[in-house]
């Protein structure tokens, strides 16, 4: 039986992970739950799952939860802050960690799980975007196991031979006959909207994704296609892919989740309904398969598949991310930080939808001008750069 810590338990991925665990209760035990500040949701989860350990991102949230758990006679040990989240990520009695904290906040807890040699179910793409080679090196050094949860990376993973699956970050695609990885994306809710109308997009419009059920931040990232840009960077690191081996294609139906093209002309595609329980179940049970509770794909109802090349005039954030990917670690760390600040400002109605790309571009240029030769050889140096990029972004937001 696998023993789980779920980081980001109150979010969309956390909910889907618990759904798979419930579907297969004889194979998974939930030992620890970690979350941000959603005390009410965490209380619900604690009442249902009765974890031994819980961590909340802030002390006030942890204190409030402690009182509520005591009132309900739930005897869970409650931790707080980043240290608390890191603690439950490296518990001796846990072998598998779902890393689903959104954004840069997930980097240190995820790295704690890596250093403890856990099986990492990586849903937090920002951790790899921010730390790149440092993360890949740590996985090897500490004997951790890395399995990708993002539907696209999980699809690519499933289409690759086992010798690559067990050597992520260090594999040789060319040696295994892979000519290219085709990273698919839906194009978000505005793929057919006139570019001139994007300035008027509201947060409510941006988070209404046509195919997937996701949290607000990733929904906005999907609308700008920054999500695909971050996934591009993540795929570069996971699969050790060169620029020539990595391509993005828009597939509005979200049925094909990504593809791998081989030298002999074969293309392997992973398909399924757009439901995160499928890739989550794949990583939770790897190399076996378990019931995810997802309806089987009915090809008689799927309809036509369409594929479109991405339009960078419509999706400038995607172009920024692809460019940053090959400029260096300073560029991807800085861009990720800028984007988190810009998306938060947009969701708070402080800036326009189209300002997100402008702010990201301004910060990327500033980071590249000031930190191109910076030695990013530790988590501390990455976090310092992340903070500086956020400061640049906040300055740009205040000027809008």
From Swiss-Prot:
InterPro entries: DXP_reductoisomerase, DXP_reductoisomerase_C, DXP_reductoisomerase_N, DXPR_C, DXPR_C_sf, NAD(P)-bd_dom_sf. Belongs to the DXR family. It comes from Aliivibrio fischeri (strain ATCC 700601 / ES114) (Vibrio fischeri). GO terms for molecular function: 1-deoxy-D-xylulose-5-phosphate reductoisomerase activity; manganese ion binding; NADPH binding. 1-deoxy-D-xylulose 5-phosphate binds at residues 125, 151-152, 186, 209, 222, 227-228, 231. Mn(2+) binds at residues 150, 152, 231. This is 1-deoxy-D-xylulose 5-phosphate reductoisomerase. NADPH binds at residues 10-13, 36, 38, 124, 126, 215. Its cofactor is Mg(2+); Mn(2+). Catalyzes the NADPH-dependent rearrangement and reduction of 1-deoxy-D-xylulose-5-phosphate (DXP) to 2-C-methyl-D-erythritol 4-phosphate (MEP). Keywords: Isoprene biosynthesis, Manganese, Metal-binding, NADP, Oxidoreductase. Pfam families: DXP_redisom_C, DXP_reductoisom, DXPR_C. The keyword Secreted does not apply. Its EC number is 1.1.1.267. It catalyses: 2-C-methyl-D-erythritol 4-phosphate + NADP(+) = 1-deoxy-D-xylulose 5-phosphate + NADPH + H(+). It comes from the Bacteria. Pathway: Isoprenoid biosynthesis; isopentenyl diphosphate biosynthesis via DXP pathway; isopentenyl diphosphate from 1-deoxy-D-xylulose 5-phosphate: step 1/6. It is an enzyme of class 1 (oxidoreductase). SUPFAM superfamilies: 1-deoxy-D-xylulose-5-phosphate reductoisomerase, C-terminal domain, Glyceraldehyde-3-phosphate dehydrogenase-like, C-terminal domain, NAD(P)-binding Rossmann-fold domains. GO terms for biological process: isopentenyl diphosphate biosynthetic process, methylerythritol 4-phosphate pathway involved in terpenoid biosynthetic process.
